[in-house]
């Protein structure tokens, strides 16, 4: 049987595989006509990808602690998240490649947690970005504003993720197309995923 460390390192390689399926907040997110937000323990961003960094920067601005990685979650898992989850499940979020989410999702199962929101962000051949979004309806409504945000989609997705409701709610799927930020080379065209992993709420 593979060790936890070997499993985490496998997740780095999984980043290159095709994708199968898909803290406190500052007052500028709070409105009286919306449900409460789920507290996020920490968000994960990947320093290799500018859009992921923009996501992390916006989350920090919103008051959510952010942790930078470079494809490998081993250090984050061993020295931060695993000790915290052993005390009790807390929600995390991120904008990463497939590998880190693959590992974190499976590790979360041991703590009665699951992915409650996921959006795949993929560069199209015509220079635009396709956002395939699956999650709670309230987050879908905020995701619709991606079109207005245009090339600054990553910062807007941080605000969408920050609207994740704390309880089970109706979910739906949608696809949104936005302009690409800048011209990119092949290495920058890796599909990214924004996601939320949270405790399972029993009906």
Indicate where each model-derived feature is located.
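N-terminal secretory signal peptides and thylakoid transit peptides that target proteins
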Residues: 1-18
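Long, contiguous hydrophobic alpha-helical segments, chiefly transmembrane helices and signal peptides
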Residues: 7-11, 43, 55, 92
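General structural signal for secondary-structure boundaries
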Residues: 14-17, 23, 96-97
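Flexible, charged surface loops at secondary-structure boundaries
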Residues: 34-39, 82-88
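Long, low-hydrophobicity ectodomains and other hydrophilic envelope-associated domains
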Residues: 47-61, 65-76, 85-203
């Amino acid at each position: 049987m593979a060790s936890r460390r070997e499993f985490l390192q496998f997740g780095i390689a999984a980043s290159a595989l095709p994708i199968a399926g898909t803290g406190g907040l500052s007052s500028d997110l709070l409105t009286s006509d919306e449900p409460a937000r789920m507290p996020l323990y920490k968000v994960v961003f990947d320093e290799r990808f500018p859009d992921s960094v923009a996501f992390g920067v916006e989350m920090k601005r919103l008051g959510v602690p952010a942790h930078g990685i470079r494809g490998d979650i081993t250090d984050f898992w061993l020295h931060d998240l695993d000790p915290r989850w052993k005390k009790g499940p807390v929600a995390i979020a991120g904008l990463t490649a497939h590998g880190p989410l693959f590992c974190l999702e499976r590790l979360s199962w041991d703590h009665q947690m699951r992915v409650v929101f996921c959006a795949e962000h993929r560069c199209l051949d015509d220079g635009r970005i396709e956002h395939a979004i699956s999650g709670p309806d309230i987050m879908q409504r905020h995701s619709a504003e991606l079109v207005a945000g245009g090339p600054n989609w990553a910062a807007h997705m941080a605000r969408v993720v920050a609207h994740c409701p704390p309880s089970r709610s109706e979910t739906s799927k949608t696809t949104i197309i936005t302009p690409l930020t800048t011209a990119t080379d092949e290495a920058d065209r890796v599909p990214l995923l924004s996601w939320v992993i949270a405790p399972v709420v029993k009906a």
